[in-house]
Amino acid sequence: MEKILRGKVIIKGIIHTLTGLYIGGSKETMEIGAIDSPVLRDAVTGEPYIPGSSLKGKMRALLERTIAGKDPNFKIDRNIGTGRNVVKIHVCDTKEQAAKCEVCRVFGSSGSKEGTNFPSRIRIRDAYFEPYTKKKLEAAETDFLFSEVKYENAIDRITAAANPRQIERVPAGSDFGFEIIYDVEEIADLSTDVENIAMLLQLIEDDYIGGNGSRGYGKVLFYLNYCVAKKIDAYKELTGSKYEKVVLQCEKEIKDETDYKDLCTIDTLKGKIAEVTKFFKEG
């Protein structure tokens, strides 16, 4: 089966952290005697960031669990982990199955045999600090540049001995700019797929991003400032042509962390899905 690209839906906004955020980096980049769990940082700027793969993986996992709760035949049985670290996901065996699966057609499927891969329809960019957040943290007296250290104790349930540890995290109140691009391949799937994307962002708001979520880390809110639907012919024309439609846009320039309150919520995006679908159906 051939995958036809009919256009793209681009969603941009801000990830606002309500609690400290931990997405782990390599300990090899830290000096001897440093903290136990460092955050992931950009190799050039040293800024912590949220990898697109982390957000995509979280969204996929939540959608799998959502569908599994409704469909007893939906299996989450493909192990992509290594050694004793078992990580199971749902993967359709064929392209035909993947094209009908709400998980695999959006997030991709590797199939079970050569030639059965179904590439993802979604692209999620790495999320970096908003300029005002970077400026604020550069001036803040934190433990490290752009981050803080949280001290925790793990208690041995038998001996009651304490095992102290240090976890680096991005402070609460930090804002990251994010971007999600959805490839429009089948117009019949468009409404369901974008509805699922919006639903998953709301689920994450009541869940967490990164590690240590059960201990309060990674609570976030999503605010949107832009959404555009672009037919494939829009890439041949000047910006603002009849082949693209901006369905959501924040007119106010975001200069500090108070301005995000003027942005749109995920519910606003949900209210625009019918408009996006109609735009692509018009041909």
Language model region names:
Residues M1-G283:
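RNA-binding basic/glycine-rich loop and surface signature characteristic of RAMP-family CRISPR effectors
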